[in-house]
Amino acid sequence: MFTTKKSMLLLFFLGTISLSLCEEERGADEEEGDGEKLMKRGLFSILKGVGKIALKGLAKNMGKMGLDLVSCKISKEC
C-alpha cells in the first residue's frame, strides 16, 4: 500500500509540473499573439485612412465633373 501511495504521489507531482509548464507556454504564446494583433490592427487603420483620403479626392473630382455637366446642360453648350 505504501508503494501505491508513493507512485500516486509521484504521478501527481509530475502532472502538476507538466501542467504548470503548459500554462507558462500558453501564456507566452498569447503574449506573442497580442503583438501580431496590434500590428494587424495598425496596418488596417493605415489602410482605412488611405482609403478615406482616396475616396474624398474621388468624390471631390466626381462632384466637379457633375457640376460641369449640369452647367453644360443648362447653358446647352454640350
Swiss-Prot record:
S-S pairs: 72-78
Distribution of this protein across tissues and organs: Expressed by the skin glands.
Any one GO cellular component localisation term in the record: extracellular region
Biological processes, Gene Ontology terms: defense response to fungus; defense response to Gram-negative bacterium; killing of cells of another organism
Protein localization: Secreted
Keyword line: Amphibian defense peptide, Antibiotic, Antimicrobial, Cleavage on pair of basic residues, Disulfide bond, Fungicide, Secreted, Signal
Principal subcellular localization: secreted
Pfam name, any one: Antimicrobial_2
Propeptide: 23-39
Transmembrane segments: none
Keyword set includes Signal: yes
Extent of the signal sequence: 1-22
InterPro entries listed in its UniProt record: Antimicrobial_frog_2, Frog_antimicrobial_propeptide
Family: Belongs to the frog skin active peptide (FSAP) family. Esculentin subfamily.
Purpose: Antimicrobial activity against the Gram-negative bacterium E.coli, the Gram-positive bacterium S.aureus and the yeast C.albicans.
Protein name: Esculentin-2PLa
The organism of origin for this protein: Lithobates palustris (Pickerel frog)
